[in-house]
């Protein structure tokens, strides 16, 4: 008959008893107890240990916990906070009468500050939800040189493969009288180039990903990949408030959202976002040095050929781009798994020693013991995502404001240029 090795709860001496025996007596100190009591005591100690880890402060006897993931209400709050902060910042600029010259140092500082609103909204959400932003937004992951190179390649192929679709969409808008004035990148010197890289690539890449993927998409993860990626990409597109960028922002939002969902590593999205902005900015700057001004280069990006022919060409190139991006994303996911491990919830087990071999005797769900497979299934069923009326209201308010703002900006370009 197999024997289980344990320790005496009174003196700590090594014990052994035959499986099936209920009573156990320590030969060293004479203490007597049952194996059932031992199991119950061990579970009680584990619960107390978990409480000590979770307990950071105690106010009026209430246990304060730090969560490690966002829910859908956090996504809604993130949208509302972004809208509220944007309105507040606009009011401040209007009241103070601050005006800056395009391309000046103050302009790029202001641009970086505006981009910082995304990050500030994410921080406020984390604080209000008592959630660790670093863990919930998956900022505790690592990257290496291969990941950086693959992120650059994905951004480049995305721009080459899907950029023509954006141009066709702009041609379509222009056909109906849409004005592209003020919507192109203008860089006249090296310092303006550095300013654009800092504000539009570094700050924007981090701040926007922190909110859109780290908070909004993370809050939708329990709803499945299609909902999480699709909704975050849609909000990402609308929040930019530019009809010119509609197609591009939607495509890049889906692309980055998919990578984040599969890897649970925010830094991959930040890198792809950075290079997605860095490549066209660098292209415009180099071309302006070689032969033409950036304004002339930008002017040539629309109105070439008929819309129909351009669309056919764009779709063919987009299909090729989709094929190569799939290959690159698979390599990126594999490299991320090599550096950080697979993207799955940690499974913890407790074990006792049986004839010198470790045997799993307890299953846990998110750190809590599940006694049977039936309990595990019931717990999973209970995790079916739901949405409250308050969350729906927050999404509705933020969404309505953003859509109206987007429509006003778009219509004004049709009517007044």
Predicted segments with their positions:
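Cys/His-rich metal-coordination motifs, chiefly Zn-binding "fingers/knuckles"
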Residues: 1-48
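Interfacial transmembrane-helix boundary/kink motif in multi-pass membrane proteins
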Residues: 56-83, 132-163, 345-347, 368-400
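Alpha-helical transmembrane segments in multi-pass membrane proteins
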Residues: 81-127
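Functionally important transmembrane alpha-helices
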Residues: 87-92, 238, 245-314, 323-327
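Juxtamembrane helix-loop-helix connectors linking adjacent transmembrane helices
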Residues: 102-108, 134-204, 403, 407-417
């Amino acid at each position: 008959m197999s024997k289980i090795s344990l320790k005496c709860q009174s003196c700590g001496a090594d014990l052994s008893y035959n499986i099936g025996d209920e009573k156990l007596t320590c030969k060293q100190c004479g203490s007597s107890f049952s194996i059932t009591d031992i199991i119950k005591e061990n579970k009680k100690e584990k619960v107390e240990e978990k409480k000590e880890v979770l307990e950071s402060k105690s106010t009026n006897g209430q246990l304060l916990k730090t969560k490690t993931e966002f829910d859908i209400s956090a996504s809604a709050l993130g949208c509302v906070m972004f809208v509220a902060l944007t309105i507040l910042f606009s009011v401040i600029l209007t009241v103070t009468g601050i005006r800056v010259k395009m391309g000046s140092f103050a302009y790029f500082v202001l641009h970086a500050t505006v981009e910082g609103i995304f990050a500030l909204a994410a921080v406020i959400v984390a604080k209000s939800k008592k959630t660790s932003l670093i863990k919930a937004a998956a900022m505790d992951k690592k990257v290496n040189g291969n990941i950086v190179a693959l992120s650059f390649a994905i951004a480049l192929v995305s721009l080459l493969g899907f950029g023509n679709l954006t141009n066709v969409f702009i041609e379509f808008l222009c056909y109906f009288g849409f004005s592209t004035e003020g919507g192109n990148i203008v860089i006249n010197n090296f310092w303006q180039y550095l300013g654009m890289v800092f504000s539009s690539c570094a700050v924007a890449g981090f701040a926007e990903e922190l909110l859109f993927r780290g908070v909004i998409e993370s809050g939708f993860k329990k709803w499945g990949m299609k909902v999480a990626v699709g909704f975050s990409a849609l909000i990402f597109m609308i929040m930019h408030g530019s009809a010119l960028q509609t197609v591009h922002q939607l495509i890049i939002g889906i692309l980055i959202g998919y990578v984040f969902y599969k890897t649970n590593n925010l830094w991959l999205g930040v890198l792809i976002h950075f290079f997605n902005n860095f490549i066209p900015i660098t292209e415009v700057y180099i071309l302006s040095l070689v032969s033409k001004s950036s304004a002339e280069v930008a002017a040539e990006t629309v109105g070439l050929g008929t819309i129909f022919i351009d669309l056919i060409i764009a779709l063919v190139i987009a299909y090729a781009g989709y094929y190569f991006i799939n290959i690159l994303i698979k390599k990126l996911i594999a490299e991320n798994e090599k550096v950080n491990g697979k993207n799955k919830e940690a499974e913890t087990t407790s074990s006792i020693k049986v004839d010198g071999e470790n045997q799993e005797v307890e299953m846990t769900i998110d750190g809590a013991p599940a006694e049977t497979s039936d309990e595990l299934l019931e717990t999973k069923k209970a995790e079916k995502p739901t949405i409250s009326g308050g969350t729906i209201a927050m999404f509705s308010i933020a969404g309505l404001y953003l859509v109206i703002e987007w429509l006003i900006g778009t219509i004004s370009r049709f009517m007044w240029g």
